[in-house]
From Swiss-Prot:
Xref: Gene3D superfamilies: lambda repressor-like DNA-binding domains (1.10.260.40)
Molecular function terms from GO: DNA binding
Protein name as annotated: Cytoskeleton protein RodZ
Oligomer status and interactors: Interacts with MltG and MreC in the elongasome. Interacts with KhpB (also called EloR/Jag).
Amino acid sequence: MTSMRKKTIGEVLRLARINQGLSLDELQKKTEIQLDMLEAMEADDFDQLPSPFYTRSFLKKYAWAVELDDQIVLDAYDSGSMITYEEVDVDEDELTGRRRSSKKKKKKTSFLPLFYFILFALSILIFVTYYVWNYIQTQPEEPSLSNYSVVQSTSSTSSVPHSSSSSSSSIESAISVSGEGNHVEIAYKTSKETVKLQLAVSDVTSWVSVSESELEGGVTLSPKKKSAEATVATKSPVTITLGVVKGVDLTVDNQTVDLSKLTAQTGQITVTFTKN
């Protein structure tokens, strides 16, 4: 049974998700939007989102995921109006049951191909093991003098990369990262009066800013403008703000910084400097 009613954006999104048979957790995996932000959109609480720019982006992703016309949703958001929605009466408990039943069927049907794959992999492993064992058994032993020469050569050769590795390690130790979630701290040892910070993206859009620099007012990085640089003094710490963390790279004096500990949607980085 269907009926045409005016609904808020959040109500339309929620009903479309239910009609698609998606839970919020499944929708989060599909859109890569945090769960609390999905809940805020369904509650029409758009003030909880980072900015109107990200609100529009999240609404567009949500609409695509549940097969809605994203332009209608965005127009309603921009004008603050409601949406005329063809509502289908749906029993949410019934949909949940269907989803569980569907998942059980998928698990049952997918078990057999997995069994055959494991069996095939074991067959290959047994064959390779037998071949290697048979090859080793048929090889004649080398004279002891020849063995000694090979060991000597290997030992002298391997000493070269060791010194290179030590040198590389001393360079990397100049930068250390601590913290996690939406805030990390970077400690950088340097004898310079100023350092160069570079922020770059490949295929995402993110607003970034660097305090105490020419980027203090912020700039938006995107596939059209992929990077921005700032020169900062080392006499005091600086704060880097990221509107979107995922997909943003940071280098300090051309040294790449590991930002994997920043796991939130948005984040802040505090950079402190100590004399080397």
